[in-house]
Swiss-Prot record:
InterPro entries: Anti-muellerian_hrmn_rcpt_II (IPR015771), Kinase-like_dom_sf (IPR011009), Prot_kinase_dom (IPR000719), Snake_toxin-like_sf (IPR045860), TGFB_receptor (IPR000333). The chain crosses the membrane at residues 149-169. The lineage of its organism: Eukaryota, Metazoa, Chordata, Craniata, Vertebrata. Interacts with type I receptor ACVR1. It is found in: Membrane. GO terms for cellular component: plasma membrane; receptor complex. It comes from Oryctolagus cuniculus (Rabbit). This is Anti-Muellerian hormone type-2 receptor. On ligand binding, forms a receptor complex consisting of two type II and two type I transmembrane serine/threonine kinases. Type II receptors phosphorylate and activate type I receptors which autophosphorylate, then bind and activate SMAD transcriptional regulators. Receptor for anti-Muellerian hormone. Glycans are attached at N66, N119. The gene is AMHR2.
Length: 569
């Protein structure tokens, strides 16, 4: 029988865990998929494996071994993403999980002490009692009576628990009869107490219904407004979105304007918390593109305004004595972008938006932080999710930058949808009917697995027709812009600020490429105006000319071979 792996001898005694931080052995065999290195901070414990990792999200180590008839081979060691059952053990006691292949079995353990995953106490012989066989785990001789007694005890415990619940319910009912009706839960009552009534608010019709809220069209003091009504069970979602809209400095032409928060309800419906927002009668970008085509100037106006709105959200700034943090939208889709009266875009629905870590926030600034990797990687519409969100490989060490990159990927899909309805980019002037991104490849309701296979495994993107080069300042300008935004490598993507600069360059081209089909270009008066210069960015933020998210960032040039002046992040 194999002994311990003896990995303790390879760990330097100088590696000590700080208080409240678990330190584990880290190892991943070649070919293992799904790295866990982002769940902790890797430390240099020696010239070769195993290494040491300091856990960020749990106080639990794990180990996985592959037992064959000849030997036990380490497959993975590291930190778990949460404290699971079994993590209270101070030693690694592996248990069989599955048959990796014929003649081998995977064993895993969880433990809650520093370096506890370096050694295992014992492994049963392959094919012995407790090792999974073709029909699953086999019970050892003599286990059946003990198992029956354990089940009997569990049944008795459940019966006692049910009896206690029944008695408690009867006592509560008797108390209600004596003391009158019970008040509503605290969460709903507190929310109602702090929200004003809006007696002049009128509801007209439902625009959209979702999982956490319904959006109505209505009026407030004679102004047409959109009213987002939350049920009482969604008070937490209401508070999170309200807190974002009420951030100082969050006013921009291309972000939906927040008007008020209050309580109420349409007609006889029960009142609940609500947000009053600016109404855009032309509807969402998806609805608009389904019913209209847009010439070159109008398409650029939509694309540029969308990039300006996202760049504003991502930007961290001080202006007029007010601090605005960077914000990741995390649910950028053509349903959540609205069309203004002038044909430009306004980004809405901040229900999943997240305040990002900053470089120069005030000392008293303490925004709520996401709790663990799952909260950081939460995203909205699957169709627009970046590859690193689909395969759960988002960079958790610098999650603020990583979420900005994921937004830029979604932005690229929206730009493709806008340009796909531009007749000036078609030889015959007839764009096809509107389709969402990946709808041609996967249909109207793709599954997560289908999106993963297409966007992650095959690295495919929506088709870019060759005729789109006609209106770029250099051949392939539009193609290069989209490809630089939806690159499979997040670090290679443009920033939203750089997307804005490239679109400005397309609005005012120096030389227009002749279109082979002879279609005329749009007139200059149809082009959208250049954006006003943005206020100075904070020290340490990406500079206005910085294109990519990498450490070395170059100026915004459409020539990939041109020399780029680097700037510090």
């Amino acid at each position: 029988m194999l002994g311990t792996l003896g990995l303790w001898a390879l760990l330097p005694a100088a590696v000590q865990a700080p208080p409240n931080r678990r330190t584990c052995v880290f190892f991943e065999a070649p070919g293992v998929r799904g790295s866990t290195k982002t769940l902790g901070e890797l430390l240099d414990a020696g010239p070769g494996p195993p290494r040491v990792i300091r856990c960020l999200y749990s106080r639990c180590c794990f180990g996985i071994w592959n037992l064959t008839r000849d030997q036990a081979q380490v497959e993975m060691q590291g930190c778990r993403d949460s404290d699971e059952p079994g993590c209270e053990s101070l030693s690694c006691d592996p248990s069989p999980r599955a048959r990796a292949s014929s003649g081998s079995t995977l064993f895993t353990c969880s433990c809650g002490a520093d370096f506890c995953n370096a050694n295992y106490s014992h492994l049963p012989p392959l094919g012995g009692p407790g090792t999974p066989g073709p029909q699953g785990p086999q019970a050892a001789p003599g286990e059946s009576p003990w198992m029956a007694l354990a089940l009997l005890g569990l049944v008795l415990l459940l019966l006692l628990l049910l009896g206690g619940i029944v008695v408690a319910l009867l006592q509560r009912k008797a108390y209600r009869v004596q003391s009158g009706p019970e008040p509503e839960p605290d969460s709903g009552r507190d929310c109602s107490e702090e929200l004003p009534e809006l007696p002049q608010l009128c509801f007209s019709q439902v625009i959209r219904e979702g999982g956490h809220a319904a959006v109505w069209a209505g009026q407030l003091q004679g102004e047409l407004v959109a009213i987002k009504v939350f049920p009482r069970r969604a008070v937490a979602q209401f508070r999170a979105e309200r807190a974002l809209y009420e951030l100082p400095g969050l006013q921009h032409n291309h972000v939906v304007r927040f008007i008020a928060a209050g309580q109420g309800g349409p007609g006889p419906l029960p009142s609940g918390p609500l947000l009053v927002l600016e109404l855009h009668p032309k509807g969402s970008l998806c609805q608009y593109l389904s019913q209209h085509t847009s010439d070159w100037g109008s398409s650029l106006r939509m694309a540029l305004s969308l990039a300006q709105g996202l760049a504003f959200l991502h930007e961290e700034r001080w202006q007029d004595g007010q601090y605005k943090p960077g914000i990741a939208h995390r649910d950028l889709s053509s349903q959540n972008v609205l069309i203004r009266e002038d044909g430009s875009c306004a980004i809405g629905d901040l229900g999943l938006a997240l305040v990002l870590p900053g470089f120069a926030q005030p000392r008293a600034w303490a925004p709520p932080q996401p709790r663990g990797p799952a909260a950081i990687m939460e995203a909205g519409t699957q169709r627009y999710m970046a590859p690193e969100l689909l395969d759960k490989s988002l960079d958790l060490q610098d999650w603020g930058t990583a979420l900005r990159r994921a937004d830029v990927y979604s932005l690229a899909l929206l730009l493709w949808e806008i340009l796909s309805r531009c007749p000036d980019l078609r030889p015959d002037g007839r764009p096809p009917p509107f389709q969402l991104a990946y709808e041609a490849e996967l249909g109207s309701a793709p599954t997560t697995c289908e999106l993963w296979a297409l966007a992650v495994e095959e690295r495919r993107r929506p088709d870019i027709p060759s005729s789109w080069c006609c209106f770029a300042t250099d051949p392939g300008g539009l193609r290069e812009l989209l490809e630089d935004c939806w690159d499979a490598d997040p670090e290679a993507r443009l920033t939203a600020e750089c997307v804005q600069q490239r679109l400005v360059a397309l609005v005012h081209p120096q030389e227009a490429q002749p279109c082979p089909e002879g279609r005329p270009h749009s007139h200059p008066e149809d082009w959208p105006p250049a954006p006003a210069p943005a206020p100075a960015l904070l020290p340490g933020s990406p500079q206005p000319g910085a294109c990519h998210f990498g450490v070395q960032q170059g100026l915004c040039s459409r020539n990939p071979g041109a020399a780029c002046a680097s700037s510090d992040v």
